[in-house]
Each structure stands twice: as C-alpha cells, then as structure tokens.
Amino acid sequence: MQNQCVLTGQVVAIEPVRHTPGGVPRQRLWLEHRSRQEQAGVARAVEARIALILAGDTAIGSAAQVREGSQIQVSGFIARAGHRGEAQDRLELHVQALVHLD
C-alpha cells in the first residue's frame, strides 16, 4: 500500500525536542501550506496546517537551521497522531526528507 506525501509551505511553529521512552529524539513542527489545485476541472484554493514529526538524530539535524517563517519542502508518510481519544482522528506527516527553500 502506498503512503507517501510531499508538501511545501511555511513553518509556523517549532516545538522543543523531546525523547521517546526508548530515548529517540522527536520534534514536532507545524507547516502551513497554501496552493491552488485543480479538482474536477475547477481551480481551488487549498490551505492546510499539519504537524510534521521529525524522529531520530538525522531528521532533527536536518531541521537545525529551520526557523519560524522558513519555507520548506518535506516528504514522508501520514499516520494518526495517537491511539486514544481525539488523536485517533488527527493526522501527522512523519518526515523522511526535508529541503530548505529559502
């Protein structure tokens, strides 16, 4: 099954690095995406805000120069934010590659 997503946008928030119980560093950034897409032959304005999850030293290192307001492109996979409550209904993008655009 396919689960791959590529988004560009502006970083609007950066949360502190935390560690999982297993000691893996993990950081959440918030990306705001705006674009025009075509759907059913009609141009449509698209706006979305999504949490980006960076896990591991390499991923967090790739975001070391990212600041609020930075334009970036990310690729990765979509997963639910958690297993209980409202988190089951929220999606996060788990980043596998990050490119600075500015």
What are these regions (language model features)?
Residues 1-102:
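Single-stranded nucleic acid-binding surfaces, predominantly the OB-fold ssDNA-binding core
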